Amino acid sequence: MAIRIKLKPGREKSLERRHPWVFSNAIHNIKGKPEAGETVDVVAHDGHWLGRGAWSPESQIQVRIWTFDREEEIDREFFARRLQRAQIGRNDLIREQGLTGYRLVAAESDGLPGITIDRYANVLVCQLLSTGADLWRDTLVELLAEQYPDCAIYERSDVDSRKKEGLLPVTGLLHGTLPEMPVIIEENGIKIAVDVIKGHKTGFYLDQRDNRAIAARFVKDKSVLNCFCYTGTFGLYAAKAGAASIENVDVSSLALATARLNMQVNGLSDDNVHYNEADVFKLLRLYRDEGKTFDVIVLDPPKFADNKAQLNGACRGYKDINMIALQLLNPGGVLLTFSCSGLMPADLFQKIVADAALDAKREIQFIERLSQASDHPIGSAFPEGFYLKGLVARAW
């Protein structure tokens, strides 16, 4: 008989709307003794069945729902179906944009909580972020090896969120032979070098693909300041689009070295590109004091808030950096600014940038709202999947 998790009265509403998380404070009792990652059934307080998911005893999210179909068993065939569905959902995008790098599985938004899989040419990179995902590792590797026989499979489960599940970090080759790093992927006709072993996240920020192309519309014959540039891909797009000058800024010398490589891989001269290993906050203040200005500024900072307690501080950080950036823009200049903090609502982020403009004594117009690329879908019952927010603002 299946292990059963009974919820407290009234706590079934989110599951009835197909949200895939059950928090520890929603649980009334447990029938059985589930092991970490084991499949459990979740029922309402009156006993009616709600969903079937993975047990995470050390997490605040104690059950992540695999399925809301009572007839669907969680077995090898289940994961095969979900992986195939995820690939089908990307096929049109791959054909349209000629992608060789894309997100294959976007965790909860693809019905596979805790499982992220990115494809970089012939390398699949997996992040397994929950006990349920961890338990099914071998099955996932077998299925991926069958469905993608030409691909190596590498694990990058080295993120802090695993600690909340009571899991240790795991990295390493799971299947096949890893090619020499970096791997070269292609998007929108541009080649990008990706190091899946040492790079951020799974190696690269695939979610900004569409926004890189949008940024390129504003840069011809313009001066561009690319902040928190990582491997310089906003600057790379700008170079190909005819920017007059580009400054790529990051604290990582390794990232900047890859930014140089990206220019070379695309056969582009970097005579008009400056690579600046610096703290962005300090550099922007210095440039303001020196009276330096730019036509286009990209702000793509790391996550400022990992939890609700950090949100107020994140708001102050976003306001400060956007205020200084706006002070550095020439009249008619364009700011592309982003937040990758899932806890930051899009409307609040826009208000922060508007308030920053007031403090900077600049009039701005919001031209576009931006989000993550379409291979990072947002499940209709999982608003948390909408994490990347961006704005394009013109300053006067």
Swiss-Prot record:
GO terms for cellular component: cytoplasm. InterPro entries: PUA (IPR002478), PUA-like_sf (IPR015947), PUA_sf (IPR036974), RLMI (IPR023542), RlmI-like_PUA (IPR041532), SAM-dep_methyl-trfase (IPR019614), SAM-dependent_MTases_sf (IPR029063). It comes from the Bacteria. PROSITE patterns: PUA (PS50890). GO terms for molecular function: RNA binding; rRNA (cytosine) methyltransferase activity. Its EC number is 2.1.1.191. Signal peptide: none annotated. It catalyses: cytidine(1962) in 23S rRNA + S-adenosyl-L-methionine = 5-methylcytidine(1962) in 23S rRNA + S-adenosyl-L-homocysteine + H(+). It holds the Pfam family PUA_3. It is found in: Cytoplasm. SUPFAM superfamilies: PUA domain-like, S-adenosyl-L-methionine-dependent methyltransferases. Residues 2-79 form the PUA domain. Disulfide bonds: none annotated. The keyword Ribonucleoprotein does not apply. Specifically methylates the cytosine at position 1962 (m5C1962) of 23S rRNA. Belongs to the methyltransferase superfamily. RlmI family. This is Ribosomal RNA large subunit methyltransferase I. The lineage of its organism: Bacteria, Pseudomonadati, Pseudomonadota, Gammaproteobacteria, Alteromonadales. The gene is rlmI.
